Curated annotation (Swiss-Prot):
Binding site for [4Fe-4S] cluster: 345, 351, 366
GO molecular function list: 4 iron, 4 sulfur cluster binding; metal ion binding; NAD binding; NADH dehydrogenase (ubiquinone) activity; quinone binding
Entry GO terms, CC: intracellular membrane-bounded organelle; mitochondrial inner membrane; respiratory chain complex I
Role of this protein: Core subunit of the mitochondrial membrane respiratory chain NADH dehydrogenase (Complex I) that is believed to belong to the minimal assembly required for catalysis. Complex I functions in the transfer of electrons from NADH to the respiratory chain. The immediate electron acceptor for the enzyme is believed to be ubiquinone.
Gene that encodes the chain: gas-1
NCBIfam families for the chain: NuoD (TIGR01962), PRK06075.1 (NF004739)
Root EC class: translocase
Protein name listed in UniProt: Probable NADH dehydrogenase [ubiquinone] iron-sulfur protein 2, mitochondrial
Keyword set, alphabetical order: 4Fe-4S, Electron transport, Iron, Iron-sulfur, Membrane, Metal-binding, Mitochondrion, Mitochondrion inner membrane, NAD, Oxidoreductase, Respiratory chain, Transit peptide, Translocase, Transport, Ubiquinone
Signal peptide interval: none
Gene3D superfamilies for this protein: Cytochrome-c3 Hydrogenase, chain B
Length: 482
């Protein structure tokens, strides 16, 4: 108040002349241009005061106050307080504008065409909205206009990191509707190639996850091994990636001579590569800081969100289609299903590492137990005849022509066949109407359910952690958008 009085005595002499010369009306609109009033920063210094009136309004109105308009300001302050809800000392929070950030689709960590709209409060994510459909190619609709054989290559292009596993799901669904059982050798070949594909996928998943959070070396070291797996795929099918190898009724070709020996030589050396990968990451304090307690998913949430694969096993649930509903040769295989305890990114990383070791175990069993025999069913309505037979037998030529022009008829019915793809439960729901083309094909992609829950997994995480979460989900947009 002392400062107030001094200011008053200094200004008193000038007030009449100002009032006389000014053409401003007596009632002033209170705004930032006419009269000063406390802002949030000023009020924070006097938090105990709580209201504008308590801060700087005098108890009685003096003639000086009336002359410079402070009495009117006082009434305004009490009728419309600036920063207070009441006069109990509670302050009204200042409204903060949250930042809306587009993450992707051209972000290097977006794993393809992922677009996330992030709502940020500082660096904390309070909302994450995935925008899908940028890689939509109407696969399910196209399959309705193709024969059962022509539909197969579309599955290579869904999850384009684990191709032969997708083919397996389609072939098993068609075989189930046809009611056929394929030869044992074909089952073992499918299982062998499926596990090599699983290792190929996990190499990609783990190393790109590490690359996203800043570790480049694992990516370059492990891709040499992935290249060797591509070579095996090329030797067995002629194509490095989109193999079109696992077909309804068996597999397209038998294993070439020498391939099993080469796979064995690779399989006994590969554990050393896994050890090198673990040396770089598992006890690395930076890697642990970026993955432990990040992307936590409880067991109940994992089930409620429809998670599968590593995403559900990392939370401690022992769920694996190869164990619960064995297909092909998995009933004859002995292997363990690794599970996590906490459900964070680090647990899921350890699960993938151990899954690669278990896949190698299955590969060795397939190589040791591989039976001799046929690789396709002996039914030329489902499987085309050999070229040698076509040149000698008229019926074989007719079967060949009918197979590649009209395809084979599947009895009416519907089925759902799940398999344990590297990313989770990949399922095919197939409806047949008795013609040579499917009536409806629905593809259950594991990544779709994982991406749908990204808001809940990332809520209140830092923006840097969303990169780690996307990496641990191992999302590929071919299967999400379809």
């Amino acid at each position: 108040m002392l400062g107030r009085k001094i200011a008053g005595t200094c200004l008193r002499a000038n007030v009449p002349s100002v009032a006389a010369t000014s053409s401003t009306p007596a009632t002033q609109t209170r705004n930032s241009h006419t009269i000063w009033y406390p802002d949030a920063k000023f009020e924070r210094q006097f938090k105990t005061g709580g209201t504008l009136g308590k801060l700087w309004m005098s108890e009685r109105v003096s003639d000086f106050d009336e002359k410079i308009g402070l009495d009117k300001l006082e009434k305004l302050a009490y009728s419309d307080p600036v920063m207070s809800d009441n006069y109990s000392g509670k302050q009204r929070e200042k409204n903060l504008e949250n930042m809306i950030l587009n993450f992707g689709p051209q972000h290097p960590a977006a794993h393809g065409v992922l677009r996330l709209v992030l709502k940020l409060e500082g660096e904390v994510i309070i909302k994450a909205i995935p925008h899908i459909g940028l890689l939509h190619r109407a696969t399910e609709k196209l399959i309705e206009h193709k024969t059962y054989t022509q539909a197969l290559p579309y599955f290579d292009r869904l999850d384009y990191v684990s191709m032969m596993c997708n083919e397996q799901a389609w072939s098993l669904a068609v075989e189930k509707l046809l009611g056929i059982d394929i030869p044992t050798r074909a089952k073992y070949i499918r299982t062998l190639m499926g596990e090599l594909t699983r290792i190929q996928n996990h190499i990609m998943g783990i190393t790109t996850h590490a690359l996203d959070v800043g570790a480049m070396t694992p990516f370059f070291w492990m891709f040499e091994e992935r290249e060797k797996l591509f070579e095996f795929s090329e030797r067995v099918s002629g194509a490095r990636m989109h193999a079109n190898y696992v077909r309804p009724g068996g597999v397209a070709w038998d294993l070439p001579i020498g391939l099993m020996d080469d796979i064995y030589d690779w399989a006994i050396k590969f554990p050393e590569r896994i050890d090198e990968l673990e040396d770089m990451l598992t006890e690395n304090r930076i890697w642990k800081a970026r993955t432990i307690d990040i992307g936590l998913v409880s067991a109940a949430d994992a089930l409620n969100w429809g998670f599968s694969g590593v995403m559900v096993r990392g939370s401690g649930i022992k769920q694996d289609v190869r164990k619960t509903e064995p297909y092909d040769a998995y009933a004859d295989m002995e292997f363990d299903v690794p599970i996590g305890t906490k459900g964070d990114c680090y647990d899921r990383y350890l699960c993938r590492i151990e899954e690669m070791r278990q896949s190698l175990n299955i590969v060795h069993q397939c190589l040791n137990k591989m039976p001799a025999g046929e690789i396709k069913v002996d039914d030329h309505k489902v499987v085309p005849p050999k070229r040698a037979e076509m040149k000698e037998n008229m019926e074989s030529l007719i079967h060949h022509f009918k197979f590649f022009t009209e395809g084979f008829q599947v009895p009416p019915g519907a089925t759902y066949v799940p398999i344990e793809a590297p990313k989770g439960e990949f399922g095919v729901y197939l409806v047949a109407d008795g013609t040579g083309k499917p009536y409806r094909c629905f593809i259950r992609a594991p990544g779709f359910a994982h991406l749908a829950a990204i808001h809940d997994v990332c809520y209140m995480s830092l923006i840097a952690d969303i990169v780690a979460v996307i990496g641990t989900m191992d999302i590929v947009f071919g299967e999400v958008d379809r």
